[in-house]
């Protein structure tokens, strides 16, 4: 408790103990100790007895004086740190640290020592090592001091960052399995600026500060974890951290990160959920501006483009461009904007392979994607448009048109063999579901059972699909629709993929009142957890069971329904109005 006082020549409890042990008159010894070590203020001696009369303990008085002096000292240290030339003020702080460091383990004075260290841009190495070696001191020191420790101790910094990265991934994954199913409030709804206010991003931003070395360490952790897990949420964090530092105008980092301007431009596109022609040209300029010998930058750019929020924006923009091309009667190969979107999409999707192989080249675009797959997708858009127009015609002008219900074999093959085709195809499915286009959805569902890398059974697609399906709630009363959706799609993968099982249960929990009773019973049985199912599936299934029980209680039994007479309410008798 009194560690360090002796080094400064200040008497402490041990000195008093020794004095009392060796003295013959303890009361006189105590009085002398108080005189020598009390507050040396002549006017105070006459005031202290007055405090005694009021029953105020001397300890309480001295503690209040001590606290006041400590606060003044802390203010003075902060003032020194902001006054005069840098060299002079740092010299003063270093001298102060040298004199006070021996008190660092004394709880009452520790804040002063920590404050001095906090304001020093370079704390002496010896003192940093002493702080690092003591867990209590390390925990108590300011983040400004910790940064100086971390920059030369990657393992310790990794220990600090690791729990935050785990927390971030858990938050993203739990958002994808949210109980709310909505088109308006989904995983991609929060704006980039809102997302950057999240706890993990803010704490990482604070930990990095303006330290380029720590920033590079975080990026290295994110690359390593992305390679190890293939989890694309690490790519999101890479972009969010850079833009969080951008928001704070941390030029020391933003000016040295070659991806800064590219990320800034892409961030604006994500905010608008669309890549317009002007920004498309800017993004193209950054890609074309990568000089020979600097190709490694492509690895970082691809990781930023692999962020699900970037992929979502690029894919939505691609589908929108295809719709515009249909109206303009233009082929995909003749649209520079569309080709650039595909180039960016390909770079994002190839991020893992590029970083893993360390071959920093843009992926080659499949010619057939542009000359065959996208025109085929445009023909689907034409089918949708002509069918919708026909349905709106007066009865006498309607032609007996039925919506195409088969898929070209080549389309299914594209979804299975080409990642780019699969990604764009899945976003087309999301588009037609959002348009409440039941016919197009039923036509495409069989093609989703087998896709490149099982992308159709990925959490992001299923999260968006289940949200969009809420718009088709009335169709769930039709057994054929439920059979196509559940039996023909979800149940083909739910036994082997727990995430699909969870998304199917989420959808059913939300829409169970609309599902035909016979089909609901069959689905409840089909989605029953097995012995290998995780807790999340069991919890969702339990929730579904509770919802169905509540539904049963609300429904009248057949006997009650038969006994209930027709609702004939007698007219209430109305009193005659009083005479005026």
Swiss-Prot record:
The modification N6-acetyllysine is found at residue 519. Its main location: nucleus. It is found in: Nucleus. InterPro entries: COBRA1. The modification Phosphoserine is found at residue 557. Disulfide bonds: none annotated. GO terms for cellular component: cytoplasm; NELF complex; nucleoplasm; nucleus. The NELF complex is composed of NELFA, NELFB, NELFCD (isoform NELF-C or isoform NELF-D) and NELFE; the N-terminus of NELFB binds to the NELFA:NELFCD subcomplex. Binds RNA which may help to stabilize the NELF complex on nucleic acid. Interacts with the first BRCT repeat of BRCA1. Interacts with KIAA1191. Interacts with NELFE. Belongs to the NELF-B family. This is Negative elongation factor B. It comes from Homo sapiens (Human).
């Amino acid at each position: 408790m009194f560690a360090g006082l002796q080094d400064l020549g200040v008497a402490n409890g041990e000195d008093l103990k020794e004095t009392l042990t060796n003295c013959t008159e303890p009361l006189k010894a105590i009085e002398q100790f108080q005189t020598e070590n009390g507050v040396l203020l002549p006017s105070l001696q006459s005031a202290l007895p007055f405090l005694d009369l009021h029953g105020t303990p001397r300890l309480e008085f001295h503690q209040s004086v001590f606290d006041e002096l400590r606060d003044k000292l802390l203010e003075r240290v902060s003032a020194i740190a902001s006054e005069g030339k840098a060299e002079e003020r740092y010299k003063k702080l270093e001298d102060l640290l040298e004199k006070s460091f021996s008190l660092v383990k004394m709880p009452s004075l520790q804040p002063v020592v920590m404050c001095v260290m906090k304001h020093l841009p370079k704390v002496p190495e010896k003192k940093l090592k002493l702080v690092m070696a003591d867990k209590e001191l390390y925990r108590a020191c300011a983040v400004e001091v910790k940064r100086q420790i971390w920059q030369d101790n990657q393992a310790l910094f990794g220990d600090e960052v690791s729990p935050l990265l785990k927390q971030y991934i858990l938050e993203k994954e739990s958002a994808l399995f949210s109980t709310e199913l909505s088109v308006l409030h989904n995983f991609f709804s929060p704006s980039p600026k809102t997302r950057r206010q999240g706890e993990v991003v803010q704490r990482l931003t604070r930990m990095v500060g303006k330290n380029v070395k720590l920033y590079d360490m975080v990026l290295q952790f994110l690359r390593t974890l992305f390679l190890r897990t293939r989890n694309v949420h690490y790519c999101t964090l890479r972009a969010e951290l850079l833009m969080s530092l951008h928001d704070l105008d941390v030029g020391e980092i933003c000016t040295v990160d070659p991806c800064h301007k590219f990320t800034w431009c892409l961030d604006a596109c994500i905010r608008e959920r669309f890549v317009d022609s002007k920004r498309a040209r800017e993004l193209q300029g950054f890609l074309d501006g990568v000089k020979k010998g600097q190709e490694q930058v492509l690895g970082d750019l691809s990781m930023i483009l692999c962020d699900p929020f970037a992929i979502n924006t690029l894919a939505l923009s691609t589908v929108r461009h295809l719709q515009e091309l249909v109206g303009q009667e233009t082929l995909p190969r003749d649209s520079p904007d569309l080709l650039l979107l595909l180039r960016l999409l390909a770079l994002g999707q190839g991020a893992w392979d590029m970083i893993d192989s360390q071959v920093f080249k843009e992926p080659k675009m499949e010619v057939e994607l542009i000359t065959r797959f996208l025109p085929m997708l445009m023909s689907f858009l034409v089918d949708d448009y002509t069918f919708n127009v026909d349905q709106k015609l007066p009865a006498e002008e309607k032609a007996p048109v039925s919506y195409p219900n088969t898929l070209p074999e080549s389309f299914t093959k594209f979804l299975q063999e080409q990642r780019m085709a699969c990604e764009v195809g899945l976003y087309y499915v999301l588009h037609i579901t959002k348009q409440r286009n039941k016919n197009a959805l039923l036509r495409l569902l069989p093609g989703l059972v087998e896709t490149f890398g099982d992308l159709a059974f990925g959490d992001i697609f299923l999260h968006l699909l289940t949200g969009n399906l809420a718009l088709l709630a009335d169709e769930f009363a039709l057994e054929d629709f439920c059979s196509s959706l559940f039996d023909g799609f979800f149940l083909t993968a739910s036994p082997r993929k727990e995430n699909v099982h969870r998304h199917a249960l989420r959808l059913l929990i939300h829409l169970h009142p609309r599902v035909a009773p016979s089909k609901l019973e069959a689905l409840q049985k089909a989605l029953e957890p097995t012995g290998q199912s995780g807790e999340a599936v069991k919890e969702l299934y339990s929730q579904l069971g509770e919802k169905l029980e509540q539904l049963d209680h609300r429904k009248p039994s057949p006997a009650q329904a038969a006994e209930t007479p027709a609702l004939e309410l007698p007219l209430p008798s109305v009193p005659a109005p009083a005479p005026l």
